[in-house]
Structure formats: C-alpha cells, structure tokens
A protein has these predicted regions:
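N-terminal mitochondrial targeting presequence
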Residues: 1-3
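Short, membrane-interfacial amphipathic segments enriched in basic
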Residues: 25-74, 249-254
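Active-site cofactor/substrate anionic-group-binding motifs, chiefly glycine-
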Residues: 69, 73, 77-133, 137
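Selective transmembrane-helix segments that form parts of the transport pathway or gating/packing helices
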Residues: 82, 86, 90, 129, ...
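Membrane-interfacial helix-loop-helix connectors in multipass membrane proteins
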Residues: 103-126, 194-236, 240, 244-266, ...
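Hydrophobic alpha-helical transmembrane segments of multi-pass membrane transport proteins
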Residues: 117-160, 245
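Short cytoplasmic-facing helical segments at TM-TM junctions of multi-pass membrane proteins
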Residues: 150-175, 257-260
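Final/C-terminal transmembrane alpha-helix of multipass membrane proteins
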Residues: 260, 266-283
Length: 289
C-alpha cells in the first residue's frame, strides 16, 4: 500500500509539472502573438484591394442610386479615352483577325468547311477576342495614365486640397473616369470588331480565294444579337474594372516619384489579371445558361 501511494504521488507531481510547463509555454506563445499583432501591418496589396472595392461601391452608389455625376469631367475623360485607345485597338484587332483567318482557312480548307469560317471568326471576335483585346489596350494606354495621374496628385497632396475645398475626390476624380471607360470601351469594341472582320475578309479573299460574300453570309448565319450583347457587356465590365483598379492604386500611392511608378506598373498588372478573371466568370454565367 505504501509503495502504491508513493507511485501515485510521483504521478501527480509529474502531471503537475507537465501542466506548469504547458501553461508557461502557452503564456509565452500568447505573449509572442500579442507583440506580433501590435507590430503587424496588413499586406499593401490587401488594403489596396479593399480600398478599390470600396471605391467601386461608392461609384455605383453615386452614379446608379443617387444619379450624381460630374458631366463635364466625364465628357472630358471620354474624349481622352477614345483617341488614346482607338488606333491601337483597331490595329491590334486587324492583325489578330488576320492571324485567326490564316489558321481557319488553312485547316478548314483541307476538310471542305470553308463555309463556316465567317461564322467562327464572328463568334471568336464577338465573344472573346474583341472585348479582351480592347480591354488590354485600355489597361495599357488609359489605365496606366489614370494611375500615374492620380498617384501624382496623391503624393503632391492635391487630393487633400480637393477635400479642403469641399470637393469629393470620388465625385470629381474617380466616378467620371470609371463611367468614361465603361461607356467608351463597348463603342471601341464595336469599331474594332468591324475592322477586324474587314481585315479577315480581305485576307481570305486575296490569299485563299474565299469570296467575301461567303464570309459575310456565314457570319450572318451564326451570329446572333446576343453575341453582340455579350461583347458590349464584357467591354462595359472590363472598362469599369480597369478604371476602378487604376483609380484605387493611384489614390493609395505613397513614396513620391518612385511610388507613382510602382503604382502605375502594379495597376496595369492587376488590371490584366482582373480582365481574364472577370471574363471567365461572365463567360461561365452567360454560356452555361
């Protein structure tokens, strides 16, 4: 009995010692985490993304719900977006269309299916190529300029001066640019689609001897009004996303001239990624109905 009691006492003492050690370890971990949280800052990308989402919500609130928009600034931005983007978008669409024409004509001529080339070109242009190409051009030409402009205003405290004068930066700087890009990109896409199809028709006729009427008839047979609609909707969404990201990254710029350059580059990269992500979800929703 005495041996058993001694064993139980030793077990109890061992358990108490283990509990004390675990408690001390827990206190040390808690203290470490507490100190780490005091000095932890969220990643710059995270809070920039949250700020950009907030900007998008504010723009929707101002424009859609409150019907509040600075028309003078918006028209100025539309006049800026068109010339900056149209020429490059048309040229890019032309060559992309001709590249696809070469592939389609070469492969489908082997199996006697030249009658479907026009339809395939039309579907490829309306559903994917035209809105994505124009969005990429917009991100590189206009989005970068917006980020650089607003970034410069931010680091030079011009945005703070606007607030001091009683002007809301969202109403004066952000909303006009978002609306301008969202309105302009569908128009640019329609023009680029026409130019791309024209270049494809010309190449098919001159290089492969396929009649322009055959291409046009095939495109008219396969294309529906919904295809033009999805092209316009994608372009509108891409324009709004690009402008919002560019404004968000511009208005969160820090670090002087170096920060402006970094924000400009980052805004273009994030915009390009966002284009393809948004494109995927729109296509998944639209074409799975």
């Amino acid at each position: 009995g005495a041996g058993e009691s001694a064993g139980n006492v030793k077990k109890y003492e061992g358990s108490a010692e283990l509990a004390t050690q675990l408690e001390a370890a827990g206190d040390a971990v808690a203290e470490y985490l507490n100190e780490a949280l005091k000095t932890w800052e969220p990643p710059k990308f995270l809070w920039r993304t949250l700020y950009t989402l907030l900007l998008l919500g504010l723009v929707v609130k101002r424009v859609v719900w409150q019907r509040k928009l600075n028309m003078q600034q918006t028209l100025q931005q539309i006049a800026r977006v068109g010339p900056d983007t149209l020429g490059v978008a048309m040229l890019t669409s032309s060559f992309v269309g001709m590249v696809f024409t070469i592939q389609f004509c070469k492969e489908f001529s082997k199996v006697g299916l030249t009658r479907v080339i026009g339809g395939l070109l039309g579907l490829a242009f309306t559903r994917e190529l035209t809105p994505v190409i124009c969005a990429i051009v917009l991100a590189g030409r206009v989005g970068s300029a917006i980020a650089a402009e607003l970034g410069t205003m931010q680091v030079s405290e011009q945005v703070d001066q606007l607030r001091t004068l009683g002007s809301d930066p969202v109403d004066y700087l952000v909303a006009p640019r978002v609306v301008a890009c969202a309105v302009s990109l569908p128009i640019l896409s329609l023009v680029s689609f026409s130019i791309g199809m024209a270049a494809s028709i010309l190449l098919a006729d001159l290089r492969y001897g396929i009649s322009p009427n055959a291409i046009i008839d095939s495109a008219a047979k396969y294309l529906e009004s919904g295809d033009i609609g999805i092209m316009s909707f994608k372009a509108l969404a891409f324009g709004a996303v690009i402008a919002t990201i560019s404004c968000g990254w511009g208005q969160t710029t820090t670090g002087g001239a170096k920060g402006v350059g970094e924000s400009t580059t980052a805004s273009v990269v994030i915009s390009l990624v966002a284009i393809f992500v948004v494109d995927f979800f729109i296509s998944l929703t639209w074409f799975q109905r």
